[in-house]
Amino acid sequence: GILDIETQRAGTSADRLIGDIVLGSSLAALPVIGYENHAGRTCLGGSVEPFGSVEGSVGHGNNDDGNIDGVRYRNVTGTYLHGPLLSKNPEVADALLASALKRRATRLGIEDSALGPLDDGEERAANAFMRARLGVK
């Protein structure tokens, strides 16, 4: 496959991993907040890294016996997080946009066109609300 991962479905639909999840990720200084609802169990190979690490006991991640979620490899980022990932985690959105713009500039041989900062006040408030609700600092 494209990524050095293996995903298998565990049992039946009753074996889904469902609920809120909080991650620490190199893409964001703030905890990454999301919701997971998946039956797949994903194991990462040695050539990829996780999107993030499950913080505390909030969430499952790639497996019910691990503490990581998602995958990162070069310009590819994957995660089981839903709900709504980018609007509750503006730092992740900014990192993905910056990476795409840098790649575009490199491919076109032009100067990197970084975007100016936006007011992330409401998005940061949504992140803070969920962290408080889930008991995560």
Please describe what each predicted stretch is.
Residues 72-137:
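Acyltransferase
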Residues 1-69:
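Pocket-forming structural segment of enzyme catalytic cores
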